[in-house]
């Protein structure tokens, strides 16, 4: 394990933690730094005409970062390193350059063959123009029923080809999902075409067209649209919805210092990159003046969307939306009051396009607070529930939304007042669709969601990457299962047969740590520090991973998607921490064959017996949903949530939210006093009051009606 400095957390308040600078080594590259990186590369290689695929921060080694953070000396501050992925026409593979921005020099450039770069917006937009002009594509459109003079009504969603043995990974290839619109505002997904062009991205031409053995002509049904004008034309009007306003008259409860945010005892760094999108680092909790580290880094590191139709070419449909396109590159500029509601703080994102120019996504990250419902409550039945305490919570939400062709992914990192950290993903957008004939047997691989529209079965599997730092660098993972107690009913040890307990298993090695969710045992995973025990329970301090939306990868072992997305074969993997091991499907995902599998399975195979007990570890968790489409998902899918929790267990002495002011608190002695003064009726009415803005739905405000009343 790398040497890390001693953690001084337990002796400092947040405001005095070292590293409280406005500029931090984990900050994303600024617009000026991106420009500088491009200038340095061009200066070093003036005769080259590179296309810039990626320019991003190379995060400093963990040990170096922590040494700087706790040394209080800027002399130890890690240098700013930019990682650039460059493309050169006629040169296979990619060029990977490392640029020292602090010293303004290229420190390394490496030519890597046998890999393909991420697909950028520049590449994708170009593809649609290429297919529209291709004679063979025009011919197939006409055969499908598209009028010859309406090629400008033909659209495509360009995807990476996934993997196709005809092309391997020596050329950068795309496949085009084809559609038709009768006008530019139509939803193309209600009129899919049945053929799939293959495009050589480098030569910018169509090299083949995959044509099904059974043709499916263009549907003559009207488009199924969802814009307001279309719904009003169909229904006559939109439904009446009275607005809900969110106000914070005293301002927000968080404060920003550079890219660091402090909120209700939490403190963390908010990063962002082209691939993972939001990255949260250096997460700690102020436990009554003791600053306790929780996680060094957390992110959604990869995802895969495998489709379930085995017919060619649909086996290629298993998008790695992060590794092949990038959640950062695909991120939306967020709109006030629409994507986020309330009192908002935004962070922009900066990227470099293929010509080396800096582009900015305004409002890429939304930071705001939401009402979190009842935080805790208890009432006493002895006085008809008049003795009561009830507190309402708020929650901090750090979010982004990215669009991957037809789908939208809404990513929410949510922090609760009781110390819980939640990751919520919401899936919306439009189903990927394919043409079908009237009355066609879909063989169970899909559902007709609209006349002649086939939506294939698919999954959305995400990989959460956690590098814990719970009260120190040496952590373990315990698999916790609920089990029935020993002994049958009537036995001495379990006479009534009702006994149950937990079975706690701590894997020692990487190989032993591979496991899956078990709903029968309510399985959870305690990420813990075995060196620090709770003074009451005697159990290790921990954060429990609670995740129940964990479908297995439906594709069979040995399938193309199983080989390429090896991280998705199991729900939990644990590996020793190593700098640079971030992406579980490998650094370069497009057009990998899966033979051998890159990323996480590769690292596990290298060191299957490496220790993951009481050391610096990374926890990889695959979760998601299996989606069998239905007509209610079309033409625009209602948002479907997926949630998981990181819940403190044996971490705090007691409920850490008890210092949140209650909305209502009446003690037994106060009830007795009110009874003595004849004010019980007024007390009962007071139980409805939570704040000055609350009111009755069909009457006047309570606080106005009883203004001046004295309750005790």
From Swiss-Prot:
Mn(2+) binds at residues 616-617. The keyword Metal-binding applies. It is found in: Cytoplasm. Its main location: cytoplasm. Pfam families: Cu_amine_oxid, Cu_amine_oxidN2, Cu_amine_oxidN3. It catalyses: a primary methyl amine + O2 + H2O = an aldehyde + H2O2 + NH4(+). GO terms for biological process: amine catabolic process; amine metabolic process; cellular detoxification; intracellular copper ion homeostasis. Disulfide bonds join 340-366. The active site is at residues 321, 407. Its cofactor is Cu cation; Zn(2+); L-topaquinone; Mn(2+). Changing residue 460 to A: Impairs copper amine oxidase activity. Keywords: Copper, Cytoplasm, Disulfide bond, Manganese, Metal-binding, Oxidoreductase, TPQ. GO terms for cellular component: ascospore-type prospore; cytoplasm; cytosol. Substrate binds at residues 319-330, 404-409. Its EC number is 1.4.3.21. The modification 2',4',5'-topaquinone is found at residue 407. Topaquinone (TPQ) is generated by copper-dependent autoxidation of a specific tyrosyl residue. GO terms for molecular function: copper ion binding; primary methylamine oxidase activity; quinone binding. Copper amine oxidase involved in the metabolism of xenobiotic and biogenic amines. Capable of catalyzing the oxidative deamination of primary amines such as ethylamine as alternate sources of nitrogen to support growth. Homodimer. This is Copper amine oxidase 1. It comes from Schizosaccharomyces pombe (strain 972 / ATCC 24843) (Fission yeast). The lineage of its organism: Eukaryota, Fungi, Dikarya, Ascomycota, Taphrinomycotina.
